[in-house]
Structures are given as structure tokens and as C-alpha cells.
Amino acid sequence: MTNIRKTHPLAKIINNSFIDLPAPSNISAWWNFGSLLGVCLILQILTGLFLAMHYTSDTTTAFSSVTHICRDVNYGWIIRYMHANGASMFFICLFLHVGRGLYYGSYMYPETWNIGIILLFAVMATAFMGYVLPWGQMSFWGATVITNLLSAIPYIGTNLVEWIWGGFSVDKATLTRFFAFHFILPFIILALAAVHLLFLHETGSNNPSGIPSDSDKIPFHPYYTIKDILGGLFLVLVLMMLVLFSPDLLGDPDNYIPANPLNTPPHIKPEWYFLFAYAILRSIPNKLGGVLALIFSILILAIIPLLHTSKQRGMMFRPLSQCLFWLLVADLLTLTWIGGQPVEHPFIIIGQLASILYFAILLVFMPIISIIENNLLKW
């Protein structure tokens, strides 16, 4: 009798994706982040579901309902902080996952890569809308500033902003619709992640060497299941340390002040994971230019495959490209720091230089260095 695991229509899908899947024998811990993102997503959906049971999306009661969750609901405080810090863990895993893709040339699988970019945008949109829900000062003013950026679109901008707001300012209608979108988007992300996986399994995983590994495959289970479980345990350990020891470390104190349209906070800034993009936005004095730079700072990932000039896939054996890659990482950390600083000298010029360097590395230096490396190897 054949194994039910291999014949049952549903079990067969699970089997071919997580059990009998042929995987390269040499994929390192950098390949763990896909499964970690899955763990993050499930965790966020579950904690979010329990929060939604007690949250009210009305301007008069939203802030109070979050306080009520933390004070009166059984274990509400831990659910709330797991959800808030879970978002930070989600983005740490996302950035490392995308960084791995850039380093090892995983972008050479265009369908998987492009769906990954759509996923990145979807997660960013979800996180932004989630940050608005507690209806603190930073929630309100963050929503006002970011939605206002759409008014930079010529001709239809103002109408578009008022349409999104559902009125002439960020108000009750805005909060209600943001809650609706924040609830539905994670399920769309879940579906997209399944498609992401589907396309990945069409080609099989890349590996650190960048060389096809068809001749050297091992079954996913038990080798990579145990590895993913270890990674997941480590993720939960770090998350729980953050939640139980310093839950407000990554948050903004201003968000403990209820939203007040008559009082602007001295420094409006988004959560830490958006600061690099916020720094790029602020580094251009023109509103439309800033918005375009902001969008292109993420969308640039879509043209990375077109800029691949190297004869090798990954950067494992390309020391010059490696130097550029780590310069890019340092540049992004600099942008993250600048995004959280006030708009004054010397932060303005540092932000502008870091923004120029970010685009220069990806669009100019990387392709040129790759050609130089090809010539050095006489390829």
C-alpha cells in the first residue's frame, strides 16, 4: 500500500513542500528566515485576532480600549506587547531575508523575487496601518504625515488624500477603515506567501555557492525541519526577552499620549523599521521628489536582476562586491539613524549623502564592480 502522505490530495501538497522536498545540502542559517517569517506571520495573526476581540476602532474609545487590554484583559498585556514587538521581529527577519537574497543572487528567480517585493510592500502597509490603531499622538500624526504625501501626486493628489481619509482630516472614518485593512491584509499576505513558495519550488532553492545543486540534494525532513524548529525557538526566545524585559524599547513614548489634533509632537517619526525610507524621503527638499525617492528606495529591488552583470550568481567568491554589499548595509544603518534625528545640521547633509550613496551602490557601483571582477578572472 502506498503511503497516504504521498497519495492524499492535501497531504501530497504538504509532503512535496515540507517533507520530501529535495533541498540543497549546503544551505546555511541565512536560509532560515523564510520559515521564521512564516512563524512571525502566524504569531501576528493569532495575537492580532485576540487583540481585535477587545479593540474598538472608534476615535473616542480606541486609546482606552488598548489601555483596557493591557490592564483588564487576562494576559492582554503580553498579547499586546507580543504583537507590537512581533512586528519588529518580522521586519528584522524581512531585512535579513532580502539581504540574503541580494548577497547570494536569489533574485535570479524573477517570479519568486517579484512576489517577495509585493509581500514586502504589503507587510509595510499592514505595519503602518497597525501603528495608527492605538490612536496615540504618534499614531495620529504619523497617519496625517504619511497619507498627506499622496497630495504630491499632480492633479488628483488632494482628492485622493481626502478619499483615503474619508473626510477633511484623519478622523473616525480613517481609523475604522485602517482597522478593516489591517485585519484583512495579513490573510492576503498569507496567500501571497503560499504563491511565493509555489514559485520557489518550481526552481528549487538557491545555495551559498550559487552553483546548481541538482546532483547533491537531501530531503527537507528531517534535516531542515529540525533546523527550522531551532531557528523558530531562537526567534521566540529573542521576542519573549524583548516583550518581558523591555517591551517599550522599540516604541515611541509619544504614543502613550492620546491623539490630539491641536498639539503636534516635536519630532514626528515612524517606527524604527521605516526610518531608512523616511530619511530618504526627507533628504529631498521637493515633496513629489521625496515621495518618488521613497517609493523607488524599495521598488529598486525589482530592477536588481537587470543590473546583474557578474558571471557568478552569488557574492561568495567576489570580495570586491562583498565590500560594496557591507557598505550598503552600513549605509542603511546610517539612514535608519538619520531618520530618527531632527531635521537640522549636520543630520540633513548626512541624510542626503547616505541617500545618494544608497542609490549609487545599487545602480552604479555594483554593476561596474561586477564587470571589473569578471575581467580580473579573465571571464
From Swiss-Prot:
Looking at the record's lineage, which domain of life comes first?
Eukaryota
Q: Which GO terms describe its molecular function?
A: metal ion binding; ubiquinol-cytochrome-c reductase activity
Q: Which gene encodes it?
A: MT-CYB
Keywords from the UniProt entry: Electron transport, Heme, Iron, Membrane, Metal-binding, Mitochondrion, Mitochondrion inner membrane, Respiratory chain, Transmembrane, Transmembrane helix, Transport, Ubiquinone
Q: Name one GO biological process term.
A: mitochondrial electron transport, ubiquinol to cytochrome c
Q: Is Lipid biosynthesis included in the keywords of this UniProt record?
A: no
Q: Which organism is it from?
A: Pekania pennanti
InterPro entries, per database record: Cyt_b/b6_C, Cyt_b/b6_C_sf, Cyt_b/b6_N, Cytb/b6-like_sf, Cytochrome_b, Cytochrome_b_C_euk/bac, Cytochrome_b_N_euk/bac, Di-haem_cyt_TM
**Chain residues that bind heme b b566:** H97, H196
Topological type in the membrane: Multi-pass membrane protein
Describe the task this protein carries out: Component of the ubiquinol-cytochrome c reductase complex (complex III or cytochrome b-c1 complex) that is part of the mitochondrial respiratory chain. The b-c1 complex mediates electron transfer from ubiquinol to cytochrome c. Contributes to the generation of a proton gradient across the mitochondrial membrane that is then used for ATP synthesis.
Listed cofactors: heme b
| Cofactor binding summary note | Binds 2 heme b groups non-covalently.
- Binding-site residues for heme b b562, renumbered to this chain: H83, H182
The family line of this record is: Belongs to the cytochrome b family.
Q: Where in the cell is it found?
A: Mitochondrion inner membrane
Chain segments annotated as transmembrane = 33-53, 77-98, 113-133, 178-198, 226-246, 288-308, 320-340, 347-367
The record lists a ubiquinone as bound by H201
Disulfide pattern: none
What additional remark is attached to this entry?
A: Heme 1 (or BL or b562) is low-potential and absorbs at about 562 nm, and heme 2 (or BH or b566) is high-potential and absorbs at about 566 nm.
Q: What is this protein called?
A: Cytochrome b
Identify one Gene Ontology CC term for this UniProt entry: respiratory chain complex III
Identify the PROSITE patterns for this entry: CYTB_CTER, CYTB_NTER
Q: Subunit structure of this entry?
A: The cytochrome bc1 complex contains 11 subunits: 3 respiratory subunits (MT-CYB, CYC1 and UQCRFS1), 2 core proteins (UQCRC1 and UQCRC2) and 6 low-molecular weight proteins (UQCRH/QCR6, UQCRB/QCR7, UQCRQ/QCR8, UQCR10/QCR9, UQCR11/QCR10 and a cleavage product of UQCRFS1). This cytochrome bc1 complex then forms a dimer.
